[in-house]
Amino acid sequence: MTVDDSLSPAGVATPHSSGIRVVVVGLGIAGLTTAIECHRKGHTVIALEKSPVIRVLGDSLGLGSNATNVLEKWADGKILQQLKSLADDISIFEALDSAGKLYAKDDAKGFGADNGMIINRGSLATTLHEYAKMLEIDIRFGAAVTGHWEDESAAGVIINGEQRLVADCVIGCDGIHSKTREAVLTKEPTAVPSGQAVFRASFDSTSVCNDPNARWILAEKGVRDRLSQYMAEGGLALSLATGKRGQNITWQLWHEDNHNANELWSEHNSAKLENALGMIRHWPIYSKVVPILRHTPKEALTDFKLVNRAALPTWISHAGRIIIIGDAAHPVLPIVGQGGGQGIEDAATVAICLQLAGKTHISLALQAVERLRYARTSIIQSSGPKIYAGVRNPDWKAIEKDPSLIMLPRPKWIFGYDVPRDVYEQFPLVKRAIEEGSSYTPKNIPPGGRYEFLHDFKE
């Protein structure tokens, strides 16, 4: 009996062999990964992006080992190695008070160079785009989706109010302010401001090298990177890090939202460095860190509003041929470090479910995606406010006794997850549950289905 090697976690199908035509809307990290994963599983992809070029806004993001486990299967590992060459080499996380006293030090397991990565968003998006082009995926820029449609046999979009595209399904990866979500939900979900915002910036370290008062941060340049988090009461915290072994400086200042922050990376106009510095001017460590922060280029700084969103009632349209994934379905607060990773997990899941269900069962495939992903992403999404609450007013005496109280949780069920293997193993069970109308409990969630502060992931 011949075994189809494409029906395996690392398997690659013959291009266009499934007969399934997919429209991917939005080419952020989730959208680019979806386009690539769908191509690898034999689907014909049309990928649409309203911007004229790949957007490179934003600073760094973390991809845990659960995300890089997907990327490592591309081109025999070459793409992941290319990304790692562009990534930061953060091997130490430090937690300090506003005077600079060190209370906790942690390795970067889950995000370290051996498995995950911390990488500039622009570098990641550009590399994924180049790989998608190499695969000859149909990518169309300047293609704003102005409408959606579906019936029992097909689905599609209207581009720029004129062109009508026909496909078997539409996958909306168009982010927090998703247009595709309008085709799924009868009303836009309520976004609840968290009361917090974060100044964010990333820039080249060259000018810092020449500043005797600032270059202390580059003491390990060429060797490794380090992330130091200075924390005070009231949720005020400064994260200061080097990147690419000292080639870059990245910093974030978490603070109370003064209503000047914006939830769009493209909005830099209201972000003023002096406003950020004024918030920490009373810190004992101020005179040490301010020389570094003053090198921030005006165009590199943004003040990003943090918004809480509850899990959506569904990700799938009424006729079952349009689905939203990634930030369009389950945006995650940045403190969790899983926004990009969960989008990548979604991408792998939807590509495999379409492959296993086949062209005549598109609706079943998308239902399977939701059943496999919904509980996991909802639990991870809910962890953001909990993690933030844990560091908002640090109890330094308790932390001195138990440093894990202040460190980012690294649960094994998140970081040790192998999404391709799980989807191939679980799809028959999910399919049966859908066909029988019975319940299905995914295997990718923690016992009890609740988020807990765990540090049980081991590399």
Swiss-Prot record:
Pathway stated in the Swiss-Prot or TrEMBL entry: Secondary metabolite biosynthesis
Catalytic residues of the enzyme: 200, 230
Molecular function per GO: FAD binding; monooxygenase activity
Alphabetical keyword list: FAD, Flavoprotein, Monooxygenase, Oxidoreductase
Binding-site list for FAD: 49, 62, 121, 327, 340
Signal peptide (from-to): none
Disulfide bond residue pairs: none
Gene3D superfamilies: FAD/NAD(P)-binding domain
InterPro entries in UniProt: FAD-bd (IPR002938), FAD-dep_Monooxygenase_BioMet (IPR050493), FAD/NAD-bd_sf (IPR036188)
Function: FAD-dependent monooxygenase; part of the gene cluster that mediates the biosynthesis of the benzazepine alkaloid nanangelenin A which contains an unprecedented 3,4-dihydro-1-benzazepine-2,5-dione-N-prenyl-N-acetoxy-anthranilamide scaffold. The first step of nanangelenin biosynthesis is catalyzed by the indoleamine 2,3-dioxygenase nanC which produces N-formyl-kynurenine through the catabolism of tryptophan. The two-module NRPS nanA then utilizes anthranilate (Ant) and L-kynurenine (L-Kyn) to assemble the dipeptide product nanangelenin B.
Name recorded for this polypeptide: FAD-dependent monooxygenase nanF
Species name: Aspergillus nanangensis
Lineage of producing organism: Eukaryota, Fungi, Dikarya, Ascomycota, Pezizomycotina
